[in-house]
């Protein structure tokens, strides 16, 4: 799974940048599935995206499966997203050896805070 995860998602993101003619230098954030911090760090380095553009929620919430990207958006950069426009690349991938990437332009979206229940 590790080999797949550091090969296919970066290739998918590079394909996205080529298809839509933009550079990762121009994005505000790269939000990756939160499966493993080491793996996400490797993907970021492989794509040459600065660490400060890659928010993490893994340490607080663990691997939350398909919810990891929206959770990371809310807890990692939610306040910033409500105050400013942002160009964001998201990439999800999983142990079923599946992956997907998207380029989204956000315009002052409303990010409600995460509600934690006991």
List the model feature ranges, each with a label.
Residues 6, 10, 28-118:
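Claisen-condensing/thiolase-fold acyl-transfer catalytic domains that form or cleave C-C bonds
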